[in-house]
Regions:
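A generic structural signal for short, solvent-exposed coil/turn residues
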Residues: 16, 46-48, 140-142, 170
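Structural beta-strand/beta-sheet cores of well-ordered domains, especially the beta-sheet scaffolds
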Residues: 20-22, 50-54, 146, 172-176
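Internal metal/ion-chelating core segments
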Residues: 165-179
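Negatively charged, low-complexity tracts enriched in Asp/Glu with abundant Ser/Thr
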Residues: 4, 16-17
Length: 179
């Protein structure tokens, strides 16, 4: 089952199973990691990432029980089984007196700049040259040996709720660890 289709299905199924407040978040993207040791690149990895996270409550206002988990969304049967177990588990958790339910009023959020840099998506093989530059600079500053990792990723996050929120955003990250 495709990620967004699974997300829509999960929300619908949880409503039918009696869940009250539901947030289903889908993340999909691609991650890259370059490792280096003794001034040499020793490993290059990349992988696709995708996951489906759920937060939900059951019960009545003032007596809500909450839980959250990540689920596998490979097929409808697997999803149904996991959702049934999640509802059963949540009904047996203590009442969460701190949770008052999801807000029902409509919010307008300002755009948050800087969480997505399209240059990260196009790094590709140039990530090796970034590593080489970092290693060379460390050597110029007196380091005899260097090691570390360069990790970067990008993707999309979509949030779907029982209060009719359906929003998504793109994200990117980059991190260099050098020692």
């Amino acid at each position: 089952m495709k990620l967004n289709s699974a997300q829509d299905y999960v929300l619908k199924q949880l409503k039918s199973l009696g869940a009250k407040d539901i947030v289903v978040t889908a993340h999909s993207g691609e991650s890259f990691q370059n490792k280096f040791a003794n001034n040499e690149v020793v490993a290059n990895k990349n992988w696709d990432t995708s996951n489906l996270s759920i937060f939900l409550s059951v019960g009545e206002n003032g007596n809500l029980r909450t839980s959250g988990t990540d689920i596998s969304y490979s097929d409808q049967t697997a999803i149904d089984s996991q959702l049934n177990r999640l509802i059963k588990f949540t009904k047996n958790t203590p009442i969460n007196k701190n949770f008052l339910g999801l807000p029902v009023e409509t919010f307008k959020y300002r755009e948050v700049r800087g969480i997505y840099d399209p240059e990260i998506k196009s790094l590709g093989k140039s990530s090796i040259s970034i590593l080489r530059d970092a290693i060379d600079l460390a050597n110029q500053k007196g380091a005899e040996r260097t090691g570390g990792t360069l990790t970067h990723n990008y993707g999309t996050t979509r949030m779907l709720t029982s209060t009719d929120i359906d929003k998504s955003y793109d994200y990117s990250n980059i991190s260099l660890s050098l020692r």
